[in-house]
UniProtKB/Swiss-Prot annotation:
CC per GO annotation: nucleus
Native species: Xenopus laevis
Alphabetically ordered keywords of this record: Activator, Developmental protein, DNA-binding, Nucleus, Transcription, Transcription regulation
Biological role: SRF is a transcription factor that binds to the serum response element (SRE), a short sequence of dyad symmetry located 300 bp to the 5' of the site of transcription initiation of some genes (such as FOS). Together with MRTFA transcription coactivator, controls expression of genes regulating the cytoskeleton during development, morphogenesis and cell migration.
Biological classification of the source: Eukaryota, Metazoa, Chordata, Craniata, Vertebrata
Regions of compositional bias (Gly residues) in chain numbering: 24-38
Gene name linked to the record: srf
Protein name according to UniProt: Serum response factor
Region Disordered: start-end pairs: 1-61, 173-223
Keyword hit for Nucleus: yes
Molecular-function GO term, any one: DNA-binding transcription factor activity, RNA polymerase II-specific
MADS-box domain sequence ranges: 98-152
Subcellular location per the Swiss-Prot or TrEMBL entry: Nucleus
Length: 448
């Protein structure tokens, strides 16, 4: 019995867990055949030693696990210090799950690389799941010993790894020499798995962020519709333009400036839907609506607002042709969708539509009492073109042009104010009220 037993263990030198099994359990008491075998470690163990060569990893019988002293004494004769229990398990415990490994540096280079590859993939997956399930911002950076850097970042934190400043800071930190361990308790505590995690960094969360980036309530603010019976717009790709405006607590746009050369009109100032003057602001050949925000100078477009795409279904849209531009950064979103419709559309209690020579805006309840605002007048408008362009700087522009040419309206004389949408279900969106300031100082009908 003893020679057979020694022959079964010889050549291993690593204790019971790595002993070689001779035959079908012959020579080792307590070991049964293929049926009803138990392993000391499961296949999902993360110790980096799953790929064992043939002959390693002995499988022991159930009766040996129940009696570790007898099985151990008979199975490891000549090897003092080796026990019959599984490494990392309590005596007498039937281990079928993962084996706990020591939290220390792995000296074996192959095992270390295998562990890094598996655990790096796992922590990247966990970061993605955390950001997706909870809608939080996550930044993860893993630098390997071979000099490769792996990152995962959500939208708001991507500049940390994509901007030149962020990349330079990361390179500086990684290229700095590894400082010896210091006696700083805060540093040791941050590097510990059980240390404090919260930092002194904070940031403000808006309502749109807290409800999810993809679930912002997008309510239409105004609608441009072709009136039945008017045939001035003939070659237009869209006869109904619907633009949606959604904002959080504050709207950064403060002013729109009209060019001084277009001072042909009189005051058009709306206060609560009522008109204080009935004149027109004449803009030759068309106008340009430019998305802008922040602190701006005259004649200079700004770049704080991005226009996102938002598809909207309308029951009256027979043939819908949409022009969509998408951008990914900014603090305020102006989703814009363009669709065709053959009838006027009323959205949120307000309507905007073109007449043969002007684009008019009024609340629906103000149509009968004269509460009509003429926003733009064309000297001659046989056709009108709606187009979107986006330059490399990320500034979205919406052009409404007539054939003679295009006149840009930079930021100056049209003020935007917030107004709650009547009958709106969501409390996070606001309707923007448009005010046109008089540019003709000699007009006697001017009201402040």
């Amino acid at each position: 019995m003893l020679p057979s037993n020694q022959a079964g263990v010889a050549g291993s030198g690593r204790g019971l867990g790595l002993a070689r099994r001779a035959g079908n359990g012959a020579g080792c008491p307590g070991i049964r055949g293929p049926g009803g075998q138990y392993s000391g470690s499961s296949g999902s163990s993360e110790s980096g030693e799953e790929e064992d060569p043939p002959g390693r990893g002995i499988k022991r019988g159930l009766n040996e696990l129940e009696l570790p002293e007898q099985g151990g004494a008979a199975g490891v004769v000549g090897y003092p210090g080796a026990s019959g229990t599984v490494s990392g398990a309590k005596p007498g415990k039937k281990t079928r799950g993962r084996v706990k490994i020591k939290m220390e540096f792995i000296d074996n280079k192959l095992r270390r690389y295998t562990t890094f590859s598996k655990r790096k993939t796992g922590i990247m997956k966990k970061a993605y799941e955390l950001s997706t399930l909870t809608g939080t911002q996550v930044l993860l950076l893993v630098a390997s010993e071979t000099g490769h850097v792996y990152t995962f970042a959500t939208r708001k934190l991507q500049p940390m790894i994509t901007s030149e400043t962020g990349k330079a800071l990361i390179q500086t930190c990684l290229n700095s020499p590894d400082s010896p361990p210091r006696s700083d308790p805060s540093t040791d505590q941050r590097m510990s798995a059980t240390g404090f995690e919260e930092t002194d960094l904070t940031y403000q969360v808006s309502e749109s962020d807290s409800s999810g980036e993809t679930k912002d309530s997008l309510k239409p603010a105004f609608t441009v519709t072709n009136l039945p019976g008017t045939s001035n717009i003939q070659t237009v790709p869209t006869t109904s333009t619907s633009m949606q405006v959604s904002s959080g607590h504050s709207f950064p746009i403060t002013n729109y400036l009209a060019p001084v050369t277009s001072a042909n009109g009189t005051v058009l100032k709306t206060e609560g839907g009522a008109m204080s003057s009935g004149g027109l602001m004449q803009i030759p050949a068309g106008f340009t609506l430019m998305s802008a925000g922040g602190a701006v100078a005259q004649q200079v477009p700004v770049q704080a607002i991005q226009v996102h795409s938002a598809a909207q279904a309308s029951p009256s849209s027979d043939s819908s042709s949409e022009l969509v531009q998408t951008s990914s950064s900014g603090t305020v979103t102006l989703p814009a969708a363009i669709m065709t419709s053959s009838v006027p559309t009323t959205v949120s209690g307000h309507m905007m539509y073109p007449s043969p020579h002007a684009v008019m805006y009024a609340p629906t309840q103000g149509l009968t009492d004269g509460g009509l605002a003429v926003l733009n007048a064309f000297s001659s408008a046989p056709q009108m073109q709606v187009s979107h362009t986006q330059e490399q700087g990320g500034v979205q522009q919406v052009f409404l042009t007539a054939p003679p040419g295009t006149v840009q309206i930079p930021v100056s004389a049209v003020q935007l104010h917030q107004m709650t949408v009547i009958g709106q279900q969501s409390s996070g969106s606001n309707l923007t009220e448009l005010q046109v300031v008089n540019l003709d100082t000699s007009n006697s009908n001017k009201n402040d």
